[in-house]
């Protein structure tokens, strides 16, 4: 069963909404029953959704902080979480 692919401005989507749309695109492309021109269009939208998700993850990652502990073990401050 072919699932509907949403259209519209990707930049307004939350991470969860963008990820869900990306999953629908992958399902449709994996089934192989989408015409070539439409496959190209939805692939391009999938790439844009992927970039949007990566951007949102980087923003979230920048907000995550690691708690610094004093020698006694009590919280002393925060520092950015190292990207790994």
UniProtKB/Swiss-Prot annotation:
Q: Where in the cell is it found?
A: Cytoplasm
Name the enzyme group at the top EC level. hydrolase
Query: Which GO BP terms, alphabetically?
Result: DNA catabolic process
Give the superkingdom in one word.
Answer: Bacteria
How does the record describe its quaternary structure? Heterooligomer composed of large and small subunits.
Q: What does this chain do? A: Bidirectionally degrades single-stranded DNA into large acid-insoluble oligonucleotides, which are then degraded further into small acid-soluble oligonucleotides.
Give the record's family classification.
Belongs to the XseB family.
> What is this protein called in UniProt?
Exodeoxyribonuclease 7 small subunit
Q: Which organism is it from?
A: Bartonella tribocorum (strain CIP 105476 / IBS 506)
Which taxonomic lineage is given here?
A: Bacteria, Pseudomonadati, Pseudomonadota, Alphaproteobacteria, Hyphomicrobiales
User: What's the encoding gene here?
Assistant: xseB
